[in-house]
């Protein structure tokens, strides 16, 4: 009986661990891009790996003029996300469409990723789907 209980607990822990795995490739809301989320030490980051507009699009809206000539494909847009109880939080998300960076939190919702950007008390949530 003790072995059965331990086996069930281990099985449940592996399912919970898998359910919280947000790493991998995600299609952004609207399907214009794909982001690869990856572990970097104890934090998560995410970089653009595909753009509908093609891989030659530049980061022209970046407020740092020295970065305006870099390609968006390969650019980190999610940085510094730390694991919390129910979500990854405390990170930043860069929006290449307007060149602004926002506070960010993400959480898994089935096969969807809820990506929330904050500006003060205001926020916007996007739903990304696993590729």
Regions found by a protein language model. Give the residues of each.
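Sec/Tat signal peptide C-region and signal peptidase I cleavage site
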Residues: 15-19
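Short loop/turn positions at the edges of beta-strands in beta-sheet-rich folds
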Residues: 29, 85, 108-109, 122
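Central antiparallel beta-sheet cores of small beta-barrel/beta-sandwich binding domains
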Residues: 22-23, 29-94, 102
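Short, exposed beta-strand-loop hairpins at the edges of beta-sheets
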Residues: 95-106, 112-120, 124
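Bacterial N-terminal signal peptides
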Residues: 7-14
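Positively charged n-region of N-terminal signal peptides that target proteins for export
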Residues: 1-4
